[in-house]
């Protein structure tokens, strides 16, 4: 068997030289560092089922205003680190005494990560196209490591979500997804996104989600085939309970290689 579900501390191999991402070596043996899918092709590696969001430069994320100071809006980013949006990074000229008129505590906003220092000071900006305050719709949260699966290879999955639900969709890198449309359409879209999160390690998921949103019965060959990920992550570094965007994209390509890519 080239792959299987494993838990932290599980013995994977006695060949320490084959240790790959998501593993550690102890007494000459390889053990799993994570709860996820182990791949035994080539180097022994483990891809986690879940992960935490760590802010990264250029990420678009959905944040909440938690405080307003004389020169900054302080944002909760869905990570261990709050972000700072300086008044100069707002798209309009704003006097510091009027900052709360534009954004106040509790407001939800799409921002871009401008910079992250070595000390994890997170600077945000709303000067990028697409940044805006969100006054309508709903926010859905998924595990951040599942974001590439929600987007899909080449944007295939998110394109289907938008087209078949008749809703606007914005996927933040921090696992927060904004949707906007009619209530019944948002209800169905929410269920579809939950399906993607819970079945992200299955193949044929893009077809399955599309059929669900169209109200079609399952039955297309391969649409609900249950297959563990044949992950190829040699050379990709993973930390405990964390997965890189590059790794997630590789997983997505492997999972959707039998499905049509819709742009």
Swiss-Prot record:
Region forming the signal peptide: none
Compositional bias ranges of the Acidic residues kind: 218-245
GO CC terms of this entry: cytoplasm; exosome (RNase complex)
An annotated GO BP: exonucleolytic trimming to generate mature 3'-end of 5.8S rRNA from tricistronic rRNA transcript (SSU-rRNA, 5.8S rRNA, LSU-rRNA)
Pfam families: ECR1_N, KH_6
Cellular location(s): Cytoplasm
Record-annotated S1 motif domain positions: 51-127
Keywords: Cytoplasm, Exosome, RNA-binding
Sequence segments annotated as region (Disordered): 213-263
KH domain ranges (all copies): 135-196
GO molecular function: poly(A) binding
Gene3D superfamilies: 2.40.50.100, K Homology domain, type 1, Nucleic acid-binding proteins
NCBIfam families, A to Z: PRK04163.1-1
Family to which this protein belongs: Belongs to the RRP4 family.
Stored PANTHER family: EXOSOME COMPLEX COMPONENT RRP4, PNAS-3 RELATED
Binding partners and assembly: Component of the archaeal exosome complex. Forms a trimer of Rrp4 and/or Csl4 subunits. The trimer associates with a hexameric ring-like arrangement composed of 3 Rrp41-Rrp42 heterodimers.
Function text: Non-catalytic component of the exosome, which is a complex involved in RNA degradation. Increases the RNA binding and the efficiency of RNA degradation. Confers strong poly(A) specificity to the exosome.
Protein name as it appears in the record: Exosome complex component Rrp4
Protein's organism: Methanococcoides burtonii (strain DSM 6242 / NBRC 107633 / OCM 468 / ACE-M)
């Amino acid at each position: 068997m080239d792959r299987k579900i494993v838990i932290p501390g599980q013995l994977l191999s006695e060949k320490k030289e084959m240790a790959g991402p998501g593993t550690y070596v102890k007494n000459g043996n390889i053990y799993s560092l994570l709860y996820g899918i182990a791949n035994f092709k080539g180097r022994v590696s483990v891809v986690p089922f879940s992960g935490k969001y760590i802010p990264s430069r250029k990420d678009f994320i959905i944040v909440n205003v938690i405080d307003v100071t004389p020169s900054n809006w302080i944002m909760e980013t869905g990570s261990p680190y709050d972000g700072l949006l300086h008044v100069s990074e707002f798209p309009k000229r704003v006097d510091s005494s009027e900052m709360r008129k534009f954004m106040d505590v509790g407001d939800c906003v799409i921002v871009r990560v401008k910079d992250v220092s070595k000390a994890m000071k997170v600077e945000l900006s709303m000067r990028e196209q697409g940044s805006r305050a969100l006054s309508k719709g709903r926010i859905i949260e998924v595990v951040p490591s599942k974001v590439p699966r929600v987007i899909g290879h080449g944007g295939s999955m998110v394109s289907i979500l938008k087209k078949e639900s008749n809703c606007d969709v914005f996927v933040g890198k921090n696992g927060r997804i904004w949707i906007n449309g009619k209530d019944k359409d948002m209800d169905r879209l929410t269920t579809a996104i939950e399906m993607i999160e819970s079945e992200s390690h299955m193949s044929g998921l893009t077809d399955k989600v599309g059929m669900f949103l169209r109200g079609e019965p399952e039955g297309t060959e391969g649409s609900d085939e249950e297959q563990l990920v044949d992950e190829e992550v040699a050379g990709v570094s993973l930390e405990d309970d964390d997965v890189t965007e590059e790794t997630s994209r590789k997983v997505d390509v492997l999972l959707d290689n039998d499905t049509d890519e819709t742009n």
